[in-house]
Amino acid sequence: MVIDMNIKEVHDSWKEKGFPYYPTDTKWRNDIFNQLVNFKRDTLIDRKNKVIGQSAHGLNLAWSYMPHAWGIKCGKMKTPMEIWEDEEHLSKGLNKILSGTFFMKKPAHMITESDMRSMLRRYSGTQMVSNFRPTAAAAMYDIFVDKDSPLEGTVAGTVWDPSMGLGS
């Protein structure tokens, strides 16, 4: 392991900060929502091959409403929250970031909340529930939901979307 003292300091520092949940403040959520709304969804649609591509835009916003997702079991795999709560596994994960094993090497002072979330999700033997990509959902709405158009005689449709998130 990279200098054990360094790992202990980083471990203790992150424990003091708390679990690296996504932000929940209104300004952050509004900024991310605006990025999602302004994303060029047509770039995801391949009509010839009938494929809707993927983009991570808006996933962080969706996860910000579901902090409980970090502790939901997927089969027999560990949850990211179990890694966070286990001193040995959390220290091993931090070591992988500090040493550049599996993750991009970073000095302790440059480890971000995003790095921590990534490590907790990808730690060996761990799985996190997945979420439907908001951009893919929006692209499907663009294709299948009528728009208000006096010219075409259509009225804006209503969407009932049971895939709108993990929920509680």
Q: Where is each model-derived feature located?
A:
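N-terminal accessory regions of S-adenosyl-L-methionine
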Residues: 1-129
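Long amphipathic N-terminal alpha/beta scaffold segment
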Residues: 124-131, 137, 153
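Conserved S-adenosyl-L-methionine
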Residues: 137-168
